[in-house]
């Protein structure tokens, strides 16, 4: 399936404290030479998504260096390419990204210039393996406007650090609360 990938890699993290003082969470080293963003980019490549935009922002220097120096994901510009975007300050806009929706809005021109019928938006700081084609197949089968991948948190974990999702019997979202002080469920956006 033809889709464009968007990787959100601009956030800072108070829960990572000293580890994120000098680098973006997506640039955190894992198992030596890998960075956390490598998992998301590998998922994109393995799902045959050939055009990927990475939205960076906070402490992005080491992340940008990693993205610019690595050819591991095989995003050749002839097939699509890997594009890195940072917030652009103009006389009309002097803001950093003010969240996920604003990051998309500030880069809407990139999406409009793309011809892929679907967009896969993923976080750059998750360590997981996912076939986005299966998500797209589910999305198309359900004739959904959008699809959110969720997971159930372990009872011992604190879900209030995530977006809490409530769904009906058909899996349709009935409520979403971003990082609530007191979580009312264990199902979180992945």
Question: What feature does the model see in each segment?
Answer:
Residues 1-190:
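Unchanged
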């Amino acid at each position: 399936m033809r889709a464009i990938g968007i990787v959100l890699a601009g956030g800072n993290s108070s829960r990572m404290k000293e580890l994120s003082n000098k680098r973006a969470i997506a640039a955190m080293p894992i198992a030596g030479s890998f960075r956390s963003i490598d998992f998301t980019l590998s998922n994109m490549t393995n799902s045959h998504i050939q055009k990927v935009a990475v939205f960076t922002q906070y402490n992005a220097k080491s992340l940008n260096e990693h993205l610019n120096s690595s050819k591991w994901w095989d995003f050749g510009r002839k097939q699509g390419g890997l594009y890195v975007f940072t917030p652009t300050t103009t006389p009309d806009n002097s803001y950093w990204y003010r969240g996920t929706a604003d990051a998309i809005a500030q880069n809407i021109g990139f999406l409009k210039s793309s011809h892929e019928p679907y967009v896969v938006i993923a976080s750059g700081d998750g360590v997981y393996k996912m076939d986005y084609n299966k998500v797209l197949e589910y999305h198309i089968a359900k004739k959904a406007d959008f699809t959110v991948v969720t997971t159930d948190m372990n009872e011992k974990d604190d879900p209030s650090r995530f977006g809490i999702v409530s769904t009906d019997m058909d899996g349709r979202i009935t409520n979403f609360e971003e990082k609530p002080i007191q979580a009312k469920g264990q199902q979180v956006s992945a």
